[in-house]
Amino acid sequence: MALLGAQLVITLIMVSVIQKLSPHFSLAKWILCSTGLSRYLHPTDDELRKLSGVPREKVKGKKDKRNGHHQANGERSTTFHIPRSLDIRLDTIPIAPYDIVHLRFYTEYQWLVDFSLYSAIVYATSEIYHFFYPLKEEINLSMVWCLLVVFFAFKLLASLTVQYFKSEESIGERSTCIVTGLAYLLIAMIILIVPEHTLEVGLDKAYHSFNTSASSFLEGQGLNSSGPASKIVVKFFIAVSCGILGALFTFPGLRMARMHWDSLKFCKDRLWLKLVLNVSFAMPFLLVILWIKPLARDYLTARVFSGMSSPILSTEAFETIRLGAVVIAVILRFLLMPIYLQAYLNLAHDRVEEQKKEAGRITNVELQKKISSIFYYLCVVTLQYVAPILMCLFFALMYKTLGEYTWSGVLKQSLPLDECSADLEYEKALLATMANERAAVEAHEFQSITPEGEQLPVEDNILTTAQSFQLSLQSLKSVFTKDVYRGLFGFATWWSCFIWFAASSLGMVYQSYFTKS
């Protein structure tokens, strides 16, 4: 309990809230059913017959000798051809809760969005509590919640991408995923050799810190080791992970670009909404720039402009603004989510309008499938919209907490130059304390040796086990320092924002090219 403290209390309360509240309220359902979204209904067979002048066929049944019933030829009686240029007007109705429960991937979408909301509440509550009562030796369980959100989002994106490899008709999509994955792998390899004074992701510092602390940890356990792995091997596996994540972001980015393109087309008269949409689309690019040191940190925290006695921002203020920008970008995307989803649902109307310009004939079943498939895949599109931004958000939250940053950096002055020496003194004191605890545990174990056949009291065994576990936990925490977390989650946050924008930009180029052609 001492290792968890208030974290366990917050987690247990949230688990109880999930159990009591989830049957009555769902943010995922509210987004789809209570934000004004409307779907298009396909015309019925009778309406199509009336518009096209196709007479109703009489069903000729033949007697089934086995059971004596009449069996109709359903395919001939329900399938007929109509002109493609038929003037069809589609009706719209608001999306109701009973309409979406049968949609594909609805359960996965609901779980991801609702669990993300609960995780955000746990994180916010923990941050507020730790602002007044800082962590000492406790485990921050809110990081486990954040990590689970990232895992669920990654798993769902992988599940959606695997669908392209299972279908025999998705050769183009399969090839696109492979090509973009290899392209992102190449880009990641190039980025990983960029020096730290240009792109401040902190991977080199993280590797050095992890290598040093891991070697010390292994030596303390009586194992000789020069380090876990070479830097080139570590960076290669990071690049492979970047390529895989880039492949998973490809079709969500293409879908996002199409929805953005259609949203701009439907809001030509509302310039303020068009401006907000464009700002939201460009926000990931601004986030990418904030990690480029000559364009962001050096310009805002080091350069002194004429007429000023100090830089515009302190180091702490810059870190806070960078983290806040990620949160603002994600919140803005969530606020614009109904507009983007309605732009997707309007594809049914666009398909009918495009079909009116074509010659030839189409069956009623094909027309109805063309219209109804838009709504059928609504939750798939919503997952493609939500999962990438949730990964960016919770990577940034983990980067802030595990990297030991603060949300109030704008209100603080820049720390003095001896900050590093103060941190070094703290680490030395921590190592000395760990050494003393290890010596105490060993002395206690030596004193607890009893003659053969005798047993230690249960209280002594429990105390010794607890002390050994706490010592092992402290040793493990000394391996994963804040520099390791800053490098790992800093790069994960930056790369997620980069491929978020790159995939969307690729989709916009695609839309521009094929629209003009």
Regions found by a protein language model. Give the residues of each.
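Alpha-helical transmembrane segments of secretory-pathway, organelle, and plasma-membrane proteins
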Residues: 1-46, 83-100, 104-517
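Charge-rich, low-complexity intrinsically disordered and helical linker regions
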Residues: 48-90
